[in-house]
């Protein structure tokens, strides 16, 4: 692996502290990436400890070969939303001491032009976390209706010029297939009338299409629900997210599972409402990277770490 494609795991110390690793514990890293967090977990496990990793990216699976000789380690090539399935196959339901989810695109994925995630590097417009399955971004843009493109860019990218961009996509694709990241970045640049001097005009559009192509928000929701069933009482759920849509889902999930539904005041309550089945306890407040970490690794700037503990 070249230095260009190396990945610096964010909030490393904070994440390891949050997992409260026991030497003989069982842990799951739902987003192995290049193994930064997994390596630190393994370093703290004793001979009886166990780490089950997951990743859908074939390059991540290849990277995991460095741990192939460690009997405490195993990895499954699948989406992290399949957390429950992996745990079930390995007889881990209700036995796991800690689950880590480091959500979003990794530095190697961004830095490799051939993956099609970055508007800063020209390459094929792919954006799939697992390029062996599903539709690429180019295939979707070639077929999608105006309203669908508008909806994705506005909702998942929080881009106020979503409709303008969608119209531009349809205008361009009538005479030229949109197959590269540069083509998409250039047409977004043309479509956006007001530029943010601190942010590339294509930032939100690329984010939106990537999230849509990989069903990222649905992935998070499914994985969070699965984590409750997989964790043992006292087990930790540790989630790192990188933008507001992801963090909102995590925050609201932990809040609901730790506080229950908001009940109406002044009305008689049913037994079910009174005895809500709370499954998690929030641990501390959201953690953000230090100024020193942001200086070392600017991509960590938007990261947020949230911690919850499984109730018994």
Swiss-Prot record:
Compartments where found: Cytoplasm
Positions of S-adenosyl-L-methionine binding: 35-37, 55, 80, 102, 109
GO CC field: cytoplasm
Record InterPro entries: RsmH, SAM-dep_MeTrfase_MraW_recog, SAM-dependent_MTases_sf
Taxonomic superkingdom: Bacteria
Disulfide bond entries: none
Swiss-Prot/TrEMBL keywords: Cytoplasm, Methyltransferase, rRNA processing, S-adenosyl-L-methionine, Transferase
Main location, first listed in the record: cytoplasm
Biological process, per Gene Ontology: rRNA base methylation
EC number annotated for this UniProt entry: 2.1.1.199
UniProt-recorded Gene Ontology molecular function terms: rRNA (cytosine-N4-)-methyltransferase activity
Reactions accelerated catalytically: cytidine(1402) in 16S rRNA + S-adenosyl-L-methionine = N(4)-methylcytidine(1402) in 16S rRNA + S-adenosyl-L-homocysteine + H(+)
Function: Specifically methylates the N4 position of cytidine in position 1402 (C1402) of 16S rRNA.
Entry similarity comment: Belongs to the methyltransferase superfamily. RsmH family.
NCBIfam families linked: 16S rRNA (cytosine(1402)-N(4))-methyltransferase RsmH
Name of the protein in question: Ribosomal RNA small subunit methyltransferase H
Organism of this sequence: Pseudoalteromonas translucida (strain TAC 125)
Gene: rsmH
